[in-house]
Amino acid sequence: MSGVGEKASGTTKTPADFLKSIRGKPVVVKLNSGVDYRGILTCLDGYMNIAMEQTEEYVNGQLKNTYGDAFVRGNNVLYISTTKGTLSDGA
């Protein structure tokens, strides 16, 4: 067999596990419109509705606005990604 589907490390991480692990951490939320929101993920529900703090809005890679709190409706979300030093976290 090719080993497809076998566990490499003995544990399987699901998308739900990933989403739980990034709560309270810096994330990038990309919308279907192409706009990026970068901030701290505070809340996420089963419909992918998102609440963020310390949020920055980027349009075409340019910072357009900053918000204390931001709420994004789940049907607008293309993806959620963790960030690596993109916020002012000292990285």
Curated annotation (Swiss-Prot):
It comes from Arabidopsis thaliana (Mouse-ear cress). Residues 14-86 form the Sm domain. Component of LSM protein complexes, which are involved in RNA processing. Component of the cytoplasmic LSM1-LSM7 complex which is involved in mRNA degradation by promoting decapping and leading to accurate 5'-3' mRNA decay. The cytoplasmic LSM1-LSM7 complex regulates developmental gene expression by the decapping of specific development-related transcripts. Component of the nuclear LSM2-LSM8 complex which is involved splicing nuclear mRNAs. The gene is LSM6B. One of its GO terms (molecular function) is mRNA binding. Its main location: cytoplasm. This is Sm-like protein LSM36B. The keyword Nucleus applies. PROSITE patterns: SM.
